[in-house]
């Protein structure tokens, strides 16, 4: 029965009805060999031939700040960009080899999320990795607290909001950050977390750097709204913000309701736990495909960002995993099988992330 489904049949499934039929089939076979075969037919560099779409409009003077230098956003037209990953956790040599392998799969740019203030060693390691790979590396920074997972150092909890703003701006300039992130909060946002979110929002206004957040993996729709409220309360244009871990919202919490509200307010919906199941959420791939399809059907394709939040060496290619190719080699083939056309896949992997990351430097 599996072999009765051809790639041509799948690519012709462009209506909502046929896409849903394809999606139901994915759920029935739980990511069977059909999906793998389709992905294999388009694997390697040919998988991401990003040449068929016109570039988005970018503001005059906009750049994307990478460790290899500031670049024009048009320079990220021919490779996928992952907006939320963890590169600096790996050994330098291993990270370089993994990135080179993922470049063959179509990766062009990767954002390294911070889970605390950057140490000099972290900065040196990321700079060394960037010098040895053609994949553009963007260093992000900030402060991270999600009770039960990580808490702020005492110094951050004791600092004033003004002092945090000054430190964020100073570190962003001296370490060449290209974004603030991942900025985290707990299931119930604590006063110190509100202080940090306000400080990051104010630092954004002083630098122009975009912001991406972390919401708890335990499924927390209200956390997304709290983060937006605090950040917007400081005067931030929410089109410069990604609310992260939106793929961890469980079906019983009606993820589409949260996703559409985030998008209606102007922010990006960060579906950034793709290609694997996070230990604290266990959302299957079929549910994550449904999230993408539902957002597209609701008219919010311009607000979707994809990533894997990958930094676990056990899941690297050297250990028979997909590493930073998880989105490209595991998740994108499922989108194709579900009927998502190539021009939309390009938008999700190329155009949306560079619209988010492009900024006009200020200050």
Predicted segment positions?
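Histidine/acidic-residue-rich catalytic or RNA/ligand-binding cores of hydrolases
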Residues: 91, 123, 149, 221-228, ...
């Amino acid at each position: 029965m599996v072999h009765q489904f051809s790639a041509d049949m799948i690519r012709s499934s462009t209506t909502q009805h046929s896409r849903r039929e394809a999606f139901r089939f994915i759920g029935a076979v739980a990511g069977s060999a059909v999906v793998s075969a389709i992905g294999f037919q388009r694997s390697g560099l040919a998988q991401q031939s990003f040449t068929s779409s016109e570039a988005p409009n970018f503001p005059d003077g906009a750049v994307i700040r990478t460790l290899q230098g500031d670049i024009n956003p048009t320079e990220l037209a021919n490779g996928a960009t992952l907006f939320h990953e963890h590169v600096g956790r790996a050994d330098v040599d291993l990270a370089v080899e993994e990135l080179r392998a993922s470049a063959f799969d179509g990766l062009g740019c990767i954002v390294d999320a911070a889970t605390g203030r950057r140490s000099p060693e972290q900065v040196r390691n990321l700079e060394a990795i960037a010098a040895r790979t053609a994949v553009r590396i963007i260093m992000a920074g900030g402060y991270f607290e999600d009770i039960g997972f990580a808490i702020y150092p005492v110094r951050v909890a004791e600092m004033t909001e003004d002092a945090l703003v000054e430190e964020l701006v100073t570190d962003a300039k001296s370490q060449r950050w290209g974004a603030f992130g991942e900025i985290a909060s707990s299931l119930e946002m604590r006063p110190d977390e509100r202080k940090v979110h306000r400080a990051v929002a104010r630092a954004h206004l002083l630098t122009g750097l975009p912001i991406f957040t972390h919401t708890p993996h335990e499924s927390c729709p209200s956390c997304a709204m709290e983060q937006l409220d605090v950040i917007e309360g400081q005067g931030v244009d929410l089109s410069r913000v990604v609310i992260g871990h939106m793929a961890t919202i469980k079906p019983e919490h009606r993820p589409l309701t949260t996703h559409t509200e985030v998008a209606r307010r102007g922010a990006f919906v960060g579906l950034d736990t793709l290609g694997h199941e996070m230990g604290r959420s266990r959302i299957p791939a079929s549910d994550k495909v449904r999230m993408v399809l539902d957002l597209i059907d609701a008219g919010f394709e311009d607000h979707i960002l994809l990533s894997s939040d990958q930094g676990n060496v056990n899941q690297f290619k050297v250990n028979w995993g997909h590493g930073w190719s998880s989105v490209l080699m595991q998740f994108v083939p499922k989108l194709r099988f579900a009927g998502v056309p190539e021009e939309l896949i390009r938008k999700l992997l190329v155009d949306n992330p560079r619209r988010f990351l492009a900024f006009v430097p200020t200050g």
